[in-house]
Design a protein with these regions (language model features):
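Histidine-acidic metal/acid-base catalytic patches
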Residues: 1-28, 53, 57, 84-89, ...
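A generic secondary-structure micro-motif detector
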Residues: 8, 41-42, 71, 110, ...
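Structural motif corresponding to the early beta-alpha repeats
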Residues: 28, 32-121, 125-130, 167, ...
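Conserved anion-binding
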Residues: 133-135
Length: 283
């Protein structure tokens, strides 16, 4: 296994500082957030690619992914991302999946998504880079089985999945081993974080980020299932627990939580890595 940090958990730092923090705490790679606020802008990613590559290489980090919010129908942006990824030597980038909208209905959204994804597949064929959809609540790929229904039409050498098991605690949860049995051929990156549910003052329930070891997701069972499924790629840490987030989430959800003070950067990066490494070695 290899270990990386999603730069979205380092909103306090610029790109150079983020790469140095990741290096300093012993990681193998970095997954760069490519969006408006930080760390690189999608519209400029082809021009920024040499700088992104230089920053990463100076820190001794492999760029394991570019995490974008580009839609499946934005073909010019996808071409730009593919060109940038080739310059950087990055094998994958994330595209934004389709949100579920009951007014449109699942079947219509599904058919449209599969059609667009097939066009993306044709666009990337032979380019040496893979487009990923993230298993994420609020989307039509909120579980491994639903994700397979979409990506299963495509070549796993070109189209893949970011498996985010903590997201399925919020929506889409299923047995860890069964989920990986379904989607394992397409899993190309794994996001690491944890989630808890808490009752609000109004008596309703909402989710919050939590410590890796304390949340509702059983990471020991998840790592065991990943190993048994043959996964040996990157664990990329997207642990936003007590991080001073400066943006809304993937589906525009409020991911801020000021109930506890932010954790210092080095202790959280080193602590998360130590926890996961020990777990991987022990399972």
């Amino acid at each position: 296994m290899k270990y990386s940090v999603f730069s979205g958990v380092l909103p306090e730092l610029d790109a150079e500082q983020a790469a140095e923090a990741v290096r300093r705490n012993g990681y193998d790679g970095i997954e760069w957030r490519v969006n408006g606020e930080y760390h690189f802008r999608e519209a400029e990613i082809d021009r920024a690619a040499p700088r992104l590559k230089a920053i990463s290489e100076a820190a001794g980090l492999e760029v394991c992914g570019l995490t974008t919010y580009v839609r499946l129908d934005q073909e010019d942006s996808i071409k730009r991302l593919a060109d940038a990824a080739n310059i950087i030597g990055c094998p994958r980038f994330r595209l934004f999946s389709a949100l579920y909208d009951p007014a449109k209905g699942y079947r219509a959204i599904y058919d449209d998504t599969v059609e667009k994804l097939k066009r993306v597949e044709a666009l990337l064929k032979g380019r040496g880079v893979k487009a990923l959809l993230e298993i994420h609540f609020g989307t039509i790929v909120c579980s491994p089985s639903l994700a397979y229904d979409v990506v299963g039409h495509c070549d796993p050498a070109v189209i893949g999945v970011i498996h985010d098991p903590a997201n399925t605690i919020i929506e889409g949860g299923m047995n860890a081993r069964m989920g990986l049995d379904i989607i394992k051929d397409y899993v190309d990156l794994v996001h690491v974080k944890n989630i808890r549910w808490e009752r609000t003052a109004e008596g309703t329930w909402r989710w919050r980020f939590d410590e890796l070891a304390d949340g509702a997701l059983d990471w020991r069972e998840t790592v065991s299932a990943l190993k048994d499924a043959g996964y040996d790629g990157y664990f990329s840490f997207e642990n936003l627990y007590r991080v001073p987030v400066q943006h809304r989430g993937y589906v525009a959800e409020d991911i801020s939580d000021t109930s506890l003070p932010p954790r210092d950067i080095d202790p959280r990066l080193s602590g998360d890595l130590a926890y996961m490494r020990a777990l991987v070695e022990d399972v």
